[in-house]
């Protein structure tokens, strides 16, 4: 059925029950050509994203998708960079005002949930353009009952969002999600060590993209139970995680997964 007349306004449903403007916003995320994978483990939360320099004249160290919102919360933007940077600045302002008012850092759940609600409300307002980006918030939160630090991941997309154990967003996200779902069935992510979780996330990236990764081509951010601050992982440590994945046994495993699911590129 033709989309004529049903994709002019964000508030109009198509006969199939779709909001085409929301679908277009998700496509804008994939057109950026980057894939992001975030994963929780036993004592940490990690986010991995491709690092690509769009112009050879740009300085590579100035191009990033990872940002600190406050000391304890990080965010990865996937999609249209200008939209993402504007949202990051708003999130930083909210976190700063919260700390000034209450004297304590804003928790990742307190920050992300209102943003998810706001994204959903924007789908009901014809006068506002949806953001062509997905924000992946990561951080550690302390359990009120036993004081244990629990890793958290919240995705904020053009339709709303959710709290997740792991996620993949952007280019070829369907393949990466299929890989993560298979691994989750074999070994729940909350039982894994940091190294095991990191290797699964990197293998998901390689499986979806169909190519080997280099440490310089991946940005990694992390929060741990020992250090609650959101920090970047060095290329040296990323290289240690990538080395076992270059072995024939690992390559055969993720190629097998890729062909088993028969997924279609978004």
UniProtKB/Swiss-Prot annotation:
Its main location: cytoplasm. GO terms for biological process: ubiquitin-dependent protein catabolic process. Signal peptide: none annotated. CDD domains: proteasome_alpha_type_6 (cd03754). Disulfide bonds: none annotated. The keyword Nucleus applies. It is found in: Cytoplasm; Nucleus. One of its GO terms (cellular component) is cytoplasm. Keywords: Cytoplasm, Nucleus, Proteasome. The 26S proteasome consists of a 20S proteasome core and two 19S regulatory subunits. The 20S proteasome core is composed of 28 subunits that are arranged in four stacked rings, resulting in a barrel-shaped structure. The two end rings are each formed by seven alpha subunits, and the two central rings are each formed by seven beta subunits. The catalytic chamber with the active sites is on the inside of the barrel. Belongs to the peptidase T1A family. This is Proteasome subunit alpha type-1. It comes from Trypanosoma brucei brucei. The lineage of its organism: Eukaryota, Discoba, Euglenozoa, Kinetoplastea, Metakinetoplastina.
